[in-house]
From Swiss-Prot:
Free-text description of this protein's post-translational modifications in UniProt: Phosphorylated. Phosphorylation is enhanced upon serum stimulation.
Protein name per UniProt: Eukaryotic translation initiation factor 3 subunit G
Renumbered residue ranges of the record's region Disordered: 1-25, 209-234
Superkingdom of the source species: Eukaryota
A GO molecular function held by the record: translation initiation factor activity
Organism: Bos taurus (Bovine)
Subunit details: Component of the eukaryotic translation initiation factor 3 (eIF-3) complex, which is composed of 13 subunits: EIF3A, EIF3B, EIF3C, EIF3D, EIF3E, EIF3F, EIF3G, EIF3H, EIF3I, EIF3J, EIF3K, EIF3L and EIF3M. The eIF-3 complex appears to include 3 stable modules: module A is composed of EIF3A, EIF3B, EIF3G and EIF3I; module B is composed of EIF3F, EIF3H, and EIF3M; and module C is composed of EIF3C, EIF3D, EIF3E, EIF3K and EIF3L. EIF3C of module C binds EIF3B of module A and EIF3H of module B, thereby linking the three modules. EIF3J is a labile subunit that binds to the eIF-3 complex via EIF3B.
Length: 320
């Protein structure tokens, strides 16, 4: 028959709780008197609650600078920031060193030494390499064969002999009918129409291939007399015409292209304003033959050019 006195064994859960309490007691006993990893278990006076924040500190030891700052986070807790810098000494020119000692002004008046990101932009360093003339000659680039073709005249207009296509000639509507009418009057064939009388043939300057010195008496044209000494210089006045009602934008080249189909031109004089350099509205054209000048008067007088009607007549001979 069971009695009230019996040995009750502790349960497994009770044994676990007792072992945990014993472990906590042992751990707390072992940690007493053992310093932390920092060497000091107490808070610094600057980090105590209620103490004011000290100013930043800078300690320079050789080429190592240590900056210590104290701040307060969002939760109101104080914390310390320690930054370590390595000081490097760089050599600079006198002008750069002098500029660094200038007093700051404006928004950077109270900034510490050094650039401020808000007001200063530090660009990348640009390295320059200086070479001598000998190295420059050795590094010359190869000549482009296309550059040689730039100076050559590949396309030639049949009307004004310009460097453009005939269909795009700006004088197609003015000089074209005049050349056609002149060719019909002279009775030229189709092949000869391209070379009307008076057109200037391209003259290429003869170059001395040997490179030797040639005296003036043996050069080309040495046997010819000067223009002022020619006896037929007076005849130019008889083959000179006067053109009026020209626009202000007219140039000698325009007159050359306009009157060249009628014959060989000896000289052109365009009256210009000394201040503006624009045309005064009249010009003198001298031909080598009087017949060419007569054809020019008949062909151009009353002709519309640059929105104006040209008036061409014989020029009065000079009294000199």
């Amino acid at each position: 028959m069971p009695t009230g006195d019996f040995d009750s064994k502790p349960s497994w859960a009770d044994q676990v709780e007792e072992e945990g309490e014993d472990d906590k007691c042992v751990t707390s006993e072992l940690l007493k008197g053992i310093p932390l990893a920092t060497g000091d278990t107490s808070l610094e006076p600057e980090l105590l609650p209620g103490a004011p924040l000290p100013p930043p500190k800078e300690v320079i030891n050789g080429n190592i600078k240590t900056v210590t700052e104290y701040r307060i986070d969002e939760d109101g807790k104080k914390f310390k920031i320690v930054r370590t810098f390595r000081i490097e000494t760089r050599k600079a020119s006198k002008a750069v060193a002098r500029r660094k000692n200038w007093k700051k002004f404006g928004n950077s008046e109270f900034d510490p030494p050094g650039p401020n990101v808000a007001t200063t932009t530090v660009s990348d360093d640009v390295s320059m390499t200086f070479i001598t003339s000998k190295e420059d000659l050795n590094c010359q680039e190869e000549e482009d064969p296309m550059n040689k073709l730039k100076g050559q005249k590949i396309v030639s207009c049949r009307i004004c002999k310009g460097d453009h296509w005939t269909t795009r000639c700006p004088y197609k509507d003015t000089l074209g009918p005049m050349q056609k009418e002149l060719a019909e009057q002279l009775g030229l064939s189709t092949g000869e129409k391209e070379k009307l009388p008076g057109e200037l043939e391209p003259v290429q300057a003869t170059q001395n291939k040997t490179g030797k010195y040639v005296p003036p008496s043996l050069r080309d044209g040495a046997s010819r007399r000067g223009e002022s000494m020619q006896p037929n210089r007076r005849a130019d006045d008889n083959a000179t015409i006067r053109v009026t009602n020209l626009s202000e934008d007219t140039r000698e080249t325009d007159l050359q292209e306009l009157f060249r189909p009628f014959g060989s031109i000896s000289r052109i004089y365009l009256a210009k304003d000394k201040t503006t350099g624009q045309s005064k509205g009249f010009a003198f054209i001298s031909f080598h033959r009087r017949e060419d000048a007569a054809r020019a008067i008949a062909g151009v007088s009353g002709f519309g050019y640059d929105h104006l009607i040209l008036n061409v007549e014989w020029a009065k001979p000079s009294t000199n």
